[in-house]
Amino acid sequence: GKAKPRLEIEGYPVEGISIGGHETCVIFPTLSLAFDIGRCPQRAVAQDFLFISHAHLDHIGGLPMYVATRGLYRLRPPTIFVPKYLRELVERLFDVHRAMDQSELNHTLVPLDIGEEYELRRDLKVRAFKTYHTIPSQGYVIYSVKQKLKQDYLGLPGSEIKRLKLSGVEITNTVT
């Protein structure tokens, strides 16, 4: 059979499902992250980071299943980003499921407000931005962060750069 065409954004493969009103989950497997969880498609379970845009069930309905399935597969607890106003409600959702099936549902919940940033890795950050929907919602932009050697230190031998760095000199600028 023919290979499925691959969708890429800025060189990152994108997978997922989006059926309006039924299910939305967009996955960036090489970054190990998903935007919204829909009904928890199997492919989403392997992603370490999850970003929830709003509380409609077609975007958040699979959340307990996502965390439970990761636990079943002995994957590390996921980091889940939610709009700040949803934090308490999402924790209550997990508490209800814990009470029903005595599972741990281990995860890290990160409430992000519009404009707030979070460091995913040394070279990757996320920032929440406002979106417009029938209920409060937000989107997330993921961007790379690099440390670039300051102009003054270009051309110096590596040993000298190392010495400066160890002595506490700021030798780099942050580039996004």
Curated annotation (Swiss-Prot):
Quote the protein name from its UniProt record. Nuclear ribonuclease Z
Q: Which InterPro entries match?
A: Metallo-B-lactamas (IPR001279), RibonucZ/Hydroxyglut_hydro (IPR036866)
Q: Which gene encodes it?
A: ELAC
Instruction: Give the reactions, separated by semicolons, that this protein catalyses.
Output: Endonucleolytic cleavage of RNA, removing extra 3' nucleotides from tRNA precursor, generating 3' termini of tRNAs. A 3'-hydroxy group is left at the tRNA terminus and a 5'-phosphoryl group is left at the trailer molecule
Instruction: Name one cellular component (GO) term.
Output: nucleus
Summarizing the function annotation, the protein's role is: Zinc phosphodiesterase, which displays some tRNA 3'-processing endonuclease activity. Probably involved in tRNA maturation, by removing a 3'-trailer from precursor tRNA.
Superkingdom of source: Eukaryota
- EC number(s): the record gives 3.1.26.11
- Keywords per UniProt: Endonuclease, Hydrolase, Metal-binding, Nuclease, Nucleus, tRNA processing, Zinc
Give the UniProt subcellular location, in the record's own words.
Nucleus
Write out the similarity annotation. Answer: Belongs to the RNase Z family.
Major localization class? nucleus
